[in-house]
Structure formats: C-alpha cells, structure tokens
Design a protein with these regions (language model features):
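Amphipathic alpha-helical segments used for helix-helix packing
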Residues: 93-115, 160-166
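C-terminal peripheral helix-coil segments that are non-catalytic and often amphipathic
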Residues: 126-134, 153, 159-210
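Short, basic, alpha-helical segments at the C-terminal edge of helix-turn-helix-like DNA-binding modules
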Residues: 58-63
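Helix-turn-helix
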Residues: 9, 13, 17-51, 55
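Short alpha-helical scaffolding segments that buttress acidic/His motifs in well-ordered protein cores
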Residues: 86-89, 103-107, 150, 154, ...
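Amphipathic alpha-helical interface segments
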Residues: 13, 17, 88, 153-157
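Amphipathic alpha-helical packing segments from all-alpha helical-bundle domains
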Residues: 64-70, 111-137, 145-148, 160, ...
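Hydrophobic alpha-helical connector segments
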Residues: 55, 69-95, 140, 146-150
Length: 210
C-alpha cells in the first residue's frame, strides 16, 4: 500500500531538486538523492518524472496562492494588502528562483499564455481589480494594466535581482531596495486618472506625428 507521507516526501524532494539544479537538470536520481530513498521507490509512487515535477510545482504554487489569497481575503485596507502581496511575491521569487522560473516555464520558454503561476497571478489580479476599481475611481482596464506592470516587475526582479544593476545601480538582493520598488509601484498605481490619460494622449499624438 502506498504511504501518503512518502509520496509527500518525494514531492518536497522534487521541489528541492528543482531549486538546486533547475527544472532541466532535475532527474529521477537527483530527486531520489534529495529524498534519501531508493531510486526504484519513485516509480512505485509516480508514473514519470514529469508527473512528479508537475505535482510538485502545483504543490509549491498552491501554497503560495493560499498565502496570497489570505492576504486579500482578510484585508482591512486594500492598499496595505496589495503591498503585502507584492512584497510576498518579490521576496518569494528571490528566495526560490528555481521553482519560480520552473512554474513560469510554459509562459517564458514556450510562449504559452498559461501555467500554474501565470494562472494564479491572473486570479489574484482579477480579484484585486474587482475589489478596487470602483473604490479607486479608476477604470477596470487601466487598473488591470497597472497591476500587470507591478506584478511583472516584482517577479522578474525577484528571479534575477541583479539583472539591471549595471544600468540602475540597484541590487534587489537588498530588501530595502525591494521595499522601495514596491512602494514606487504602488504610488504610480493610483496616479490620478486625468494625469494618466493626458500622458497617454500625448504619447499617442507623438506616435502619430513623429
């Protein structure tokens, strides 16, 4: 009879292996080594490495989604909750870049508009937009666009915190810099609509008459 505890141990070992070696270099052997079990045990619990990886990523992202959803569902202040969510994503993707990259693999590497992290973020953004658009007096689509920018910026800089350091001289390994970025993003999120529309119209005219 299959032991659920052993199965869970193998999934956790898969997550560790992905984080250490990357999704491309994670093998049945690296997972078995991380779990401290016999190589043959893995085939008893899972049909393939692909199944293990898929379930492990679903577990990791599911846990993150539960935390994000809790921030939003238990909020007493919309902006404070959104700040917590963005910092959680920023810190989490920095702490677990391998798993974050792997969970975005379908979107980043294959160009597919789907994937577990992608789907999670879509659900969270949708809930935030529905909850804040009327209160913030910002059109639904404009708020959604701004949130996409904020979520993308935190994820990309979390995965690769020094990617833009040569140009910006900002290292996002330093938490103070991560906090500053999130606060800057939030400040721009609720930029007055009239000002945003004026800027957009000016840019559109420049495109028409270069």
């Amino acid at each position: 009879m299959k032991d659920p505890a052993v199965r869970n141990k193998l999934l956790l070992a898969t997550i560790e292996s992905i984080e250490k070696y990357g999704i491309e270099s994670t093998t049945i052997r690296t997972i078995a080594k991380e779990a401290g079990v016999a190589f043959s045990s893995l085939h008893y619990y899972f049909e393939s490495k692909e199944q293990m990886v898929a379930e492990a990523l679903e577990m990791a992202v599911g846990n993150a989604y539960s935390d994000l959803w809790a921030f939003w569902q238990t909020r007493t202040d919309d902006l404070a909750a959104l700040r917590e969510i963005l910092l959680f994503l920023f810190d989490g993707s920095l702490q677990f870049p391998g798993v974050t990259r792997a969970s975005l693999h379908a979107m980043l590497m294959l160009g597919q508009p789907e994937g577990i992290t992608h789907n999670m973020i879509n659900r969270v953004i949708g809930a935030i937009v529905d909850g804040m658009a009327c209160k913030a007096d910002i059109p639904h689509d404009l708020l959604a666009q701004r949130l996409i920018v904020a979520f993308s910026a935190t994820l990309i800089n979390g995965i690769s915190p020094q990617a833009f350091e040569s140009g910006t001289r900002i290292d996002y390994n330093v938490r103070e810099n991560r906090v500053r970025m999130v606060d800057t993003l939030l400040a721009g999120l609720f930029k007055p609509l009239a000002e945003a529309e004026t800027t957009a119209n000016q840019n559109a005219k420049q495109e028409e008459n270069p």
